[in-house]
């Protein structure tokens, strides 16, 4: 009887801890969130060079079958990026009203057009600028880089 009670208490404790933790987005949004992280988030401030873009675009699997023409890496902590989702909603390029804007440090990587996948070559441009991201879920998380 005591063992069963201990197991019940442990299960209750586990469920309580899970409940106190961050609420995870739904599976569909989680996949989009993970893709956003892979394609756009690099908290270290090591961007800015062509070499950086060439390496990161390859590491993040954006050059496997074709050279992605343009990509932006955000050099901010994920919590700073997620906080953008709590700003006022604005209209996205696709017409939806789930976009938000904020100012962050970025490296923009633009395909030079002189190479072929998987050995794509990029030009880098580092700056601090306004970005627009689409957010979904509860809590809201970034799922798409809109500009």
From Swiss-Prot:
- This protein's UniProt keywords: Antibiotic, Antimicrobial, Disulfide bond, Endonuclease, Hydrolase, Nuclease, Pyrrolidone carboxylic acid, Secreted, Signal
Q: List the cysteine pairs that form cystine.
A: 53-109, 67-120, 85-135, 92-99
| Domain of life (superkingdom) | Eukaryota
PANTHER family named among the record's database cross-references: RIBONUCLEASE (PTHR11437), RIBONUCLEASE 4 (PTHR11437:SF53)
What protein name is recorded for this chain?
Answer: Ribonuclease 4
Which InterPro entries does the UniProt entry name for this protein?
Answer: RNaseA, RNaseA-like_dom_sf, RNaseA_AS, RNaseA_domain
SUPFAM superfamilies from the UniProt entry: RNase A-like (SSF54076)
Species annotation: Pan troglodytes
Q: Which family does it belong to?
A: Belongs to the pancreatic ribonuclease family.
Q: EC? A: 3.1.27.-
What biological processes does GO assign it?
Answer: antibacterial humoral response; defense response to Gram-positive bacterium
- List the GO cellular component terms: extracellular space
| Stated role | Cleaves preferentially after uridine bases. Has antimicrobial activity against uropathogenic E.coli (UPEC). Probably contributes to urinary tract sterility.
Q: Which Pfam families match?
A: RnaseA (PF00074)
Q: What class of enzyme is it?
A: hydrolase
Q: Where is the signal peptide?
A: 1-28
């Amino acid at each position: 009887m005591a063992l069963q009670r201990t197991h019940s208490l442990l299960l209750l404790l586990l469920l309580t801890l899970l409940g106190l933790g961050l609420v995870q987005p739904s599976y569909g949004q989680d996949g989009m969130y993970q893709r956003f992280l892979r394609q756009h988030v690099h908290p270290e401030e090591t961007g800015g060079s062509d070499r950086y873009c060439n390496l990161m675009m390859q590491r993040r699997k954006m050059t496997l079958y074709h050279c992605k023409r343009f990509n932006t890496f955000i050099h901010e902590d994920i919590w700073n990026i997620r906080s953008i989702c709590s700003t006022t909603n604005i209209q996205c390029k696709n017409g939806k009203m789930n976009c938000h804007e904020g100012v962050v440090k970025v490296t923009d990587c633009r395909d030079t057009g002189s190479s072929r996948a998987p050995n794509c070559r990029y030009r880098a441009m580092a700056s601090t600028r306004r970005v627009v991201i689409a957010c979904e879920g509860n809590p809201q998380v970034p799922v798409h880089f809109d500009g």
